[in-house]
Amino acid sequence: MTDPSQSKNAPAPVAFVTGATGLLGNNLVRALLAEGFQVRALARSEAKAKQQFDGLPIEIITGDLQSISSFSAALFGVDILFHTAAYFRDSYTGGNHDQDLEAINVKAMKELLDTSWKAGIRRMVHVSSIAVLKGAKGQTVDETMLRREDEADPYFRSKIRSEKVLNDFLADYPEFWACMVLPGWMHGPGDRGPTSAGQTVLDVARGKLPGIPPGSVSLVDARDVALAIIACLSKGKRGERYLAAGRHQTMADLIPLIARLTDRKAPSRQIPMPLLYVIAALSEVQARLTRKPVLMSWATAKALASENDRSHFSAHRFHHDLGLTFRPLEETLTDEINWFRKAGFLP
């Protein structure tokens, strides 16, 4: 699955991974090592990176997308840039985050591209999001069905703009090669954050979920997304999008499955949308008072409402262009739960 341009006698290609300690990033690092890459892993915290990677043969680069100059020297000698880092909804503490979204997802993207080009990097896989796409309820959405900025929330809008930055760069630099992978709601082992996906599993396992939230998602294993990212190097086309969104799942089906796999009783009641908005409003207030991450942000509640049954995404390019298949949902959740137990999140 590695880049076919690399001969057997050539030194192992050097990969630079942003967001390396995140759910996707750490699974990508492991997949790259398995494919024979040398890996430079960007992390804001060296201690967190050492805990996450536990002695794996990688080079940890300490740095932050808000200060790209602090790690720019580590970009020299890199063959491929994998950009998984972003400011996203799981980072929210309630309130308005437009400034951070623009700074990290859009402006830092442009600076990273410019700096990488100057360092000699000519290949990149950018992790975008299903947020840049939109279709009608129940419709199968493919990579061509773009969401308009004027109908996007701040996070969705920032991902649309980050893609535009990359496409503009590709137009200006014909020698630069890049494509985009669009994940769904990622689950899987290694979710040390945890993300909203992992927190949902933990809440069900701990019996803390008061009811089943409304809505639907497109759920994917982070390891499958990592494989798609690597497959793009040999099978992807310049400037193209590749959905790695997984499968449509209603929360009404997903929550009982998690409960069964964690030996818990599933919540018996469903949370109506009006009540979800009340919970989100109260969570925003609590987050502002405590400065802790919001349990249910207003943006998340709005997204659940607006995106309900808009989680049917095409897997054609994933299957036919990249030659991949999604692993069973139960396997993903079982591995995720087992990892949480091993890591001490669950007994």
Which sequence ranges carry the predicted segments?
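Glycine/proline-rich active-site loop of Rossmann-fold NAD(P)-dependent oxidoreductases
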Residues: P174-F176, G188-Q199, C232-Y242, R264-A266
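N-terminal Rossmann NAD(P)H-binding glycine-rich loop of SDR-like oxidoreductase domains
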Residues: P13-E35
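NAD(P)H-binding glycine-rich loop region in Rossmannoid oxidoreductase-like domains
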Residues: D54-K107, T115
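Substrate-positioning beta->alpha
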Residues: E111, S196, P213-S234, E240
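Mid/C-terminal beta-alpha module of Rossmann-like enzyme folds, strongest
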Residues: A228-W298, A315, D321, P328-P347
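A conserved pocket-lining segment of Rossmann-fold NAD(P)-dependent short-chain dehydrogenase/reductase
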Residues: T93, R147-D150, Q199-V220, D224
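Conserved Rossmann-fold NAD(P)-dependent oxidoreductase catalytic core, especially the SDR/UDP-sugar
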Residues: H83, Y87, D98-Q99, A103-Y155
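Active-site Tyr-X1-5-Lys
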Residues: A152-C179
